[in-house]
Amino acid sequence: MKRRRRDLKQAAESEQEECQSVPQVVSLRDSDQLQIMDEKGDNSLALLPAKLPMRMCSTRERRKYTCEIPPDLLMEIVMRLPAKSMVRFKCISKQWSSLISCRYFCNSLFTSVTRKKQPHIHMCLVDHGGQRVLLSLSSTSPDNTCYVVDQDLSLTGMGGFFLNLVRGLLCFSVREKACIYNPTTRQRLTLPAIKSDIIALKDERKDIRYYIGHDPVNDQYKLVCTIGISSAFFTNLKSEHWVFVLEAGGSWRKVRTLESYHPHAPSTVGQFINGSVVYYMAWLDMDTCAVVSFDITSEELTTIIVTLEAGDVALPAGRMKAGLIQYHGEIAVFDHTHLKEKFLVDLWVLKDAGMKKWSKKRLVLQPCQKHLVHDDIELVVKGTTQDGKVILAPVNMCSQLYILCYDMGSNDLRKVEIKGVPDIWFDKECYFDLKYSLDESEDVIYLET
């Protein structure tokens, strides 16, 4: 009996020694310096010798073994954590919350080369009854031949129309209001409605589009709104533009236009956000297509008419099928109007925005890939991937949801399946939109308005 008690006592002492050698949970305390605390929170940085029992140390003795982690090193350590973990760790202390929430730290996430970045696709589904869902898709294969819905990130009741994004922030419209959503922090903002100066009369069409961009000079996120009102065939065009700075006390402010300004109707598709510049397609009339650029910093609007070459026939707005893409760092109009009938694509590249010069390039689909383009499925441009492939998606959902990726360099068209979409969305007509995340970054900033 005594021997058994002695064995139990030795086992308990051994277990206590092992527990003392285990690294303690790190935290920060409310001080001017970033420090790591011990499990009781009594001292900075519990880097004590493993053989020295913590309970036998006085506060003065433990401080003798304390050392400080430099703030820049601590920031480097935190930056290697997943974004979702950063959000959870904000509750450790006020100092951690201040570090992770500060603008400098958030901006460093977009320039860090040590962070593991994974491209993904955001997809919105909206039915006629107003039911919505926001899905997040990621690739399951190295060659990106299949994207699967992450069920843990699926949000019912989230999402809307005309999805676009910048630096990890999603922008979409719900009932003519702009909504901002941060998938990392799960924060959602609904901005107030705009009191427009132009009113749509009976039988007139009203188009409202929201775009989000980032001002790198003032480090501000801004929302741009274009409102266009027109009669049939884009006659009697009127348009105006508004800006909202995402900061405390922000409000809609009307943009002043120059005398050379062209009223226009924003296109349903055809938008591209290059961080500090927003580009979108528009129509000046039924036969004149243009690209409108809005500089987020200077808040200047520029209208660039897509000029035709000799022998080209202008397509009316109702027939032209095109979208904006990025082509070797330049803005381009990807015109796939004749893709299904003639298996060709016209690419209009903006060579000089200041001089408004365009360059045309024609691409012809390989004969062995013509079966990927069906006559009964209408396609729409959904942007470009990080490696320059154009994303084409069906306008309407089908039982086998997919996208087409077109490599303009090798003239190769590939089909990419999308799996995991709830079956209930295939049994009804719904609005379907998706955006490929070009910057691959996540933002942990908390937005205030």
UniProtKB/Swiss-Prot annotation:
Coiled coil: none annotated. Residues 1-21 are annotated as: Disordered. SUPFAM superfamilies: F-box domain (SSF81383). Residues 63-113 form the F-box domain. Gene3D superfamilies: 1.20.1280.50. Pfam families: F-box, FBA_3. It comes from the Eukaryota. PANTHER family: BNAA05G37150D PROTEIN-RELATED, F-BOX ASSOCIATED DOMAIN-CONTAINING PROTEIN. This is F-box protein At2g40910. It comes from Arabidopsis thaliana (Mouse-ear cress).
